[in-house]
Regions:
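Conserved "right-hand" nucleotidyltransferase catalytic core of DNA-directed polymerases
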Residues: 1-175, 180-186, 192-193
Length: 193
C-alpha cells in the first residue's frame, strides 16, 4: 500500500475535463427543466414598517418574498414536493425538517423527484471531479498522478482511504476510465476488503 501511495494512480486529465463538461451540460439541462416548471419557491413573510415607493412596499401590508428555485437545496426540494406533488414526509430531522435524500427521492418516484435526484447526483459527481476540497483534478500532479492514502490501520482492519477517497469512485464506466494504467504498463486489480 505504501508503494501504491508513493507511485500514485495515473489520472486521465483530458477525459476528466470532458466528463466535467458533459456533467455540467446535463446539470444545466436538468436545472432548466426544473426552473421552467417550478421557477420560484416561497420565501419569508415580510411586513414593511414604512412605505417604500421604489420597492413597491406599503406599510403594514404583508407579502411573501419569492426565491428562485435552487434544485440542490433540500429545503426547496421539500417545498416543491409538498406543494406541487402532495408529498407527505415520513421522516423528519432533529430540527423538524423533512429528510430529503437519495433514498427518499427514489421512493417517491415521480418525474420531478427523479429530476431532483439527478441534480443531487450530478452535484456529488462534480464535487469528486473538480469542485470538492479533495477533487481529483485539484489533487492530480503535473505528471497526471493522484497520490491517495490507503491504510489498514482501522479497528476492523478494513481499508481506510483519504485525500481523495478513491474507493468511492462511481462504477459508471465514464468514471472508471479516468483511472488507467500508466502508458506502457498493465493495471492489475485486487479486492483488499
Amino acid at each position: 500500500l505504501q508503494q501504491q501511495e508513493e507511485h500514485g494512480w495515473y489520472f486521465n486529465e483530458r477525459a476528466a475535463c470532458e466528463l466535467e463538461q458533459t456533467l455540467r451540460r446535463e446539470m444545466e439541462e436538468t436545472v432548466g427543466i426544473l426552473r421552467s416548471k417550478y421557477g420560484f419557491v416561497s420565501g419569508a413573510l415580510f411586513t414593511p414598517k414604512r412605505n417604500n415607493r421604489t420597492q413597491g412596499y406599503v406599510q403594514g401590508c404583508s407579502f411573501t418574498k419569492l426565491k428562485q428555485l435552487n434544485p440542490t437545496s433540500r429545503d426547496h426540494i421539500a417545498w416543491i414536493l409538498k406543494t406541487h406533488e402532495n408529498w407527505t414526509p415520513t421522516k423528519l430531522t432533529a430540527t423538524g425538517k423533512p429528510v430529503v435524500d437519495e433514498t427518499v427521492l427514489k421512493d417517491i418516484g415521480s418525474e420531478t423527484s427523479l429530476l431532483f435526484l439527478k441534480c443531487l447526483d450530478i452535484t456529488k459527481k462534480l464535487g469528486m471531479i473538480s469542485e470538492g476540497v479533495n477533487a481529483w483534478q485539484k489533487l492530480s500532479t503535473t505528471c497526471n498522478r493522484i497520490h491517495h492514502h490507503c491504510s489498514v490501520a482501522t479497528n476492523t482492519f478494513r481499508c481506510a482511504h483519504r485525500k481523495p477517497n478513491l474507493a468511492q469512485v462511481p462504477s459508471d464506466e465514464r468514471f472508471r476510465k479516468l483511472f488507467q494504467a500508466t502508458p506502457t504498463k498493465v493495471l492489475v486489480s485486487a479486492d483488499l476488503s
